[in-house]
């Protein structure tokens, strides 16, 4: 179960005045999934579904990371993005 702070950061990232880069969004997605679900157990998307494939690969790269560590890293990343895009 994720913390209240994690849930607040997940909302805050959607309210940034500037959209994060594609790489930042992939990292956010992967950390969010690892924190909320755990290791990726989904089937790898087909080669022609590039967007979902990139998301799947980003999440897959976190396999073995604890949900608690992923949550902490997600919160830290959101804080960095808030500082970067809100200034």
Swiss-Prot record:
Binding positions for an acyl-CoA? 29-33, 51, 55, 74
Q: Which cysteines are joined by disulfide bonds?
A: none
- What does the record list as GO biological process? fatty acid metabolic process; very long-chain fatty acid biosynthetic process
User: Tell me, what is one Gene Ontology molecular-function annotation carried by this entry?
Assistant: long-chain fatty acyl-CoA binding
Give the Pfam families listed for this entry: ACBP
Q: Which residues does UniProt assign to the signal peptide?
A: none
Q: Supply the InterPro entries for this chain.
A: Acyl-CoA-binding_prot_CS (IPR022408), Acyl-CoA-binding_protein (IPR000582), Acyl-CoA-binding_sf (IPR035984), FERM/acyl-CoA-bd_prot_sf (IPR014352)
Question: CDD domains, alphabetically?
Answer: ACBP
A Gene Ontology term for the protein's cellular component: extracellular region
Which part of the chain holds the cross-link Glycyl lysine isopeptide (Lys-Gly) (interchain with G-Cter in ubiquitin)? 51, 72
Q: Which UniProt keywords apply?
A: Isopeptide bond, Lipid-binding, Transport, Ubl conjugation
* Tree of life domain: Eukaryota
- ACB domain location is 2-87
Question: Which Gene3D superfamilies does this chain map to?
Answer: 1.20.80.10
Q: Which family does it belong to?
A: Belongs to the ACBP family.
**What is the protein's known function?**
Binds medium- and long-chain acyl-CoA esters with very high affinity and may function as an intracellular carrier of acyl-CoA esters. Enhances the in vitro activity of the ceramide synthase complex.
Any additional notes? Present with 8500 molecules/cell in log phase SD medium.
* Record-given protein name: Acyl-CoA-binding protein
Q: Which organism is it from?
A: Saccharomyces cerevisiae (strain ATCC 204508 / S288c)
- What is the organism lineage in this UniProt record? Eukaryota, Fungi, Dikarya, Ascomycota, Saccharomycotina
């Amino acid at each position: 179960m994720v913390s209240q702070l994690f849930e607040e950061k997940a909302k805050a990232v959607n309210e940034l005045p500037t959209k994060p880069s594609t790489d930042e969004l992939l990292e956010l997605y992967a950390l969010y999934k690892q924190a909320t679900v755990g290791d990726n157990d989904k089937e790898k998307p087909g080669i022609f579904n590039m967007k979902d494939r990139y998301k799947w690969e980003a999440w897959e790269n976190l396999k073995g990371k604890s949900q608690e560590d992923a949550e902490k890293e997600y919160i830290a990343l959101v804080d960095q993005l808030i500082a970067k895009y809100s200034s």
